[in-house]
């Protein structure tokens, strides 16, 4: 059966829900799709639809970021429901790296929790420009004074991490009641989406640069071949274009035989799209998450590079102690994390939290990087620094 075609009539924005586990992110995602479906702007998704993998449903926790599509009057959104459990911060990083804006979900009954802080910090570190706050479970925590207190606390926290805490929209609602069809709470979802439309800026897309998609997932469609999915970081791609798969393994060349977005076929994928790309003659085991799909010759894999790095202060969620040459943390580039050893410049014995430093890094596996590539450095479940590549060497 021929797939329906994706019609590009509204600007496309990538957005996501972040926040502490069990504060209601997945329920809110389901509620948004269900409320918008009544206006013909989405396909209603239940909690179980959003919470896709069986392992997630058993634990009631979202692990791999899952995508939902919907529209408002002015925009087309891809909504990623970000994992909220501490073990899955890694997924949050790759999910958040794709977000043009975020909805921070906070249960009015609990207030700000450890992961609330961590997610705001991560959103800042991966460059999410604006956050809208949804104060959830207000049907349960009905005391307006308590709601005011939580709102005040979250505004202070947003300001502390470099967001505009004073002006950020804070919507008070109940994802569960909206999902159940209560009109009072459904109106709060409309209010939330109006805030998202107006507060989260339309991203500038680099469509004129060479094509690059960071591979997030790989699967096989029987009879058709291997599909890679991910967000197009830059450039455009058409069916029959040649592409290279770069990083982690030897570079491979292939041809694009199909492009899809939200189960609809696409003539052209462009920067900002969350697309599935069908590849000719590639087996599922030949390609993996963390590689990139690129215009041939536009980017090379490197194991060694020099970078300008900022080491986070303790107050920013970073280390309490200095780092020295030989330190081996994980380096997060797009959808991959690779261990690397650092070498500090001659004459520099150690780097204190809060310092900027130029360092050389040797990764244990080659990654597709170029001058200007951004990365985070993590160790033991927390971000300890971030930086950008200033020079690559083979």
UniProtKB/Swiss-Prot annotation:
SUPFAM superfamilies: EF-Tu/eEF-1alpha/eIF2-gamma C-terminal domain, P-loop containing nucleoside triphosphate hydrolases, Translation proteins. Residues 10-204 form the tr-type G domain. Residues 174-176 are annotated as: G5. Residues 136-139 are annotated as: G4. Residues 19-26 are annotated as: G1. Residues 81-84 are annotated as: G3. It is found in: Cytoplasm. Belongs to the TRAFAC class translation factor GTPase superfamily. Classic translation factor GTPase family. EF-Tu/EF-1A subfamily. PANTHER family: ELONGATION FACTOR TU, MITOCHONDRIAL (PTHR43721:SF22), ELONGATION FACTOR TU-RELATED (PTHR43721). This is Elongation factor Tu. It comes from Ureaplasma urealyticum serovar 10 (strain ATCC 33699 / Western). The lineage of its organism: Bacteria, Bacillati, Mycoplasmatota, Mycoplasmoidales, Mycoplasmoidaceae.
